[in-house]
From Swiss-Prot:
It comes from Leptosphaeria maculans. GO terms for molecular function: heme binding; iron ion binding; monooxygenase activity; oxidoreductase activity, acting on paired donors, with incorporation or reduction of molecular oxygen. It is found in: Membrane. Pathway: Mycotoxin biosynthesis. Belongs to the cytochrome P450 family. Heme binds at C410. It holds the Pfam family p450. The gene is sirC. The keyword Membrane applies. This is Cytochrome P450 monooxygenase sirC. SUPFAM superfamilies: Cytochrome P450 (SSF48264). Glycans are attached at N399. Its cofactor is heme. It is a single-pass membrane protein.
Amino acid sequence: MESIVYETQPLLRGMVVGTIMLLCYRYGLALSILQLYLNFMYRITNEKGKPLRGPEFSWPDGQTVEKFLQGGQKSFSWQAYGPLYRIWTVFRPEVVITRPEDVKAFFFDSHTHQKAASSNAGWLFSQILGDCLGLINGERWSRVRHAFDPFFTRKISAQRLPHIMAAGEGYVNEVHQYDLGGKQAASTINLNAVDAFQRFPFFYVAEIIYGPLGITERVELWKLAETHTNIFRRLVQGGIHRYKATKFLSTSAYKETAHFVAAWRQFTLELAQKQLREGRTSPLTDLMAEVEDGKVTLNEVLHTIDESLFANLDVTTHVLTWAIVLLGNHPDVQELVRSEIKANTNDLETYMNRKDTLLHYSLLESLRVRPLLAFTIPESAQEDKVLSGYRVPKNIRYNLSTFGFGPRKCLGQHMAENMIKAILVPLLRQFRFKLLADQYKNGEYKVDKTNWVTLSDVNLEMERVPSGGS
């Protein structure tokens, strides 16, 4: 997220930073010197010459780790610096936008914006997601988007609605298998929200891309997902994994990542070859044909499937399970939504497509109360912006929103909404649910503090609704 002035002098800048790092190691002077250097080189001021404020650089990753693992807390405390402030991702500044008028000014030309390379997350991250659709720009983005778009359009998502509704109901019918005490036949079961519901969006998206999967393939794919989750937990910790040195040092994180990349590649290629031998077609075989024709690269396909499947496992799980948890903690709203669903039983497809229902508003409210990330994937404008009175140079990275703005909105946003409603509707028809004791204390829910998104770690009591949903 460098200023364009210094894009033309990477060697000089690297030498200066390297010298400062050496001083840090040898004399313990680095933080003071480095902070002075960064403030000088990336100075952003308003018309009165007042510099843009923000937290001081924290060795060695700036605010990178805090942004991911303590984002909710820090998003409040850092606003003490003002409605527009600066944080550091290692040695790269990111400007954080919080006011609607600045959002409007920044996204006015969103079609020209550039995503940060590998989301400013470093070298090891780039090995699994560096070439994915969400993090590439320009002509590359257009090529890859064109290859994947046919499988995720609004029209296609609407056509899949009856299927996804049936799949959601089937999943809820079997959710008792995740009972924490093994009481699968009981009228009341206890579930962990994430453990019980995360597989539904994962395998639904997997079968959109891969086509029908056998039991062995599903088991293998889920093992890959668990490995991917472990890798992400280590990546957001920063440190040596940001640099290629992690490979030369053969760190355990690098070894695990290399194993995942090889196993993931093998799984995908072998499945595509199997489908072709059997005379079957799927989005996967279509994408491999695009690779053979040279329209996209294999890495672009693999990384974008990874983005849609593994990276978005936590994303969709977050939205779905927080909606369930929040409804569980607000029984009055839960009953109103349940009554609304019952009143629309004769035409659930139309009901699920509507944007003016309490169900839809509840989903939006859960996104507001429990946003996916306090800070979003950084992107940059291609011209200077005046925000809250500060002139921010082009190519400085910004943080903001949920599904994005303009043509770069999330590829699967329509499908994601349908998947979430496809679980919520049968769940509310079949169960009343509430939080178990000690899951919500002093205004705080139990959460997984190791994940890059703030997943809940909440257990629920699920009581079956008598036939008829009364």
